[in-house]
UniProtKB/Swiss-Prot annotation:
Belongs to the RNase PH family. The lineage of its organism: Bacteria, Pseudomonadati, Pseudomonadota, Alphaproteobacteria, Hyphomicrobiales. It comes from Methylorubrum extorquens (strain CM4 / NCIMB 13688). Signal peptide: none annotated. Phosphate binds at R86, G124, T125, R126. Transmembrane segments: none annotated. This is Ribonuclease PH. Coiled coil: none annotated.
């Protein structure tokens, strides 16, 4: 049995609260159970230098954890001089996921930076970040359209993400920290609203996993993402 007593295919309670940051063009507070992430989307009128003259915009992301988001205080990464390898990996993943569903030429030569700040971590911070970041980005684009900065919605589709793993021999959906820290296999799936796969990250911690187990994890993930996309739709309605 899972520590949370959830069924194998059950997500934690998920909420998406919009417009939580007064000054950001778009914002969302996302919760996956006890994991809470504040996502803000900010418009910058200039894109990256390497896109100058291309007529194309850019979407990028930054990720950070508050010092007491975890059981014990962690040092702010700014005090060490640079982001950790884990932080860089996660923020690149968030950016790739958002760009996969964005029509970049529709932005013009502008950049949207989505900041994902983990308030409380209980597993699945990167998947929660992607799911909430999409809502913040949606609202940023709506803000831009309302002011005639852009004429069309650059979003091509929804995107959301969920973790899956093998815990005590059983494939399960949406691991919390207790499961993640003891799982034999841990994987993250980023999937669009139409069911297209943006990215898969999977690691066997103890025993290699089989093709059959991977396909079961994929099935669980697609079901989980379908539910998350429906929550996104309701949140922006």
């Amino acid at each position: 049995m899972r520590p949370s007593k959830r069924a194998a295919d059950a997500m934690r309670d998920v909420t998406l609260e919009r417009a939580v940051a007064r000054y950001a063009e778009g914002s969302c507070l996302v919760t996956f159970g006890n994991t809470r992430v504040l996502c803000t989307a900010s418009l910058e009128e200039r894109g990256p230098p390497w896109l100058r003259g291309s007529g194309k915009g850019w979407v990028t992301a930054e990720y950070a954890m508050l010092p007491r988001a975890t059981h014990e205080r962690t040092r702010r990464e700014v005090n060490s001089g640079k982001p950790s390898g884990r932080t860089q990996e996660i923020q690149r993943l968030i950016g790739r996921s958002l760009r996969a569903v964005t029509n970049l030429p529709a932005l013009g030569e502008r950049q949207i930076t989505v900041d994902c700040d983990v308030i409380q971590a209980d597993g699945g911070t990167r998947t929660a970040s992607i799911t909430g970041a999409w809502v913040a980005l949606h609202d940023c684009f709506a803000w831009m359209r309302a002011r005639s900065i852009i004429s069309v919605d650059p979003l091509k589709d929804h995107v959301a993400a969920v973790s899956c793993g093998i815990y005590k021999g059983q494939p399960v959906l949406d691991l919390d920290y207790a499961e993640d820290s003891a799982a034999e296999t841990d994987a993250n799936f980023v999937v669009t609203g139409k069911g297209g796969i943006v990215e898969v990250q999977g690691t066997a911690e103890l025993e290699p996993f089989t093709d059959e187990q991977f396909l079961e994890l994929l099935r669980l993930a697609k079901g989980g993402v379908a539910g998350l996309v429906e929550l996104q739709r309701k949140a922006i309605a």
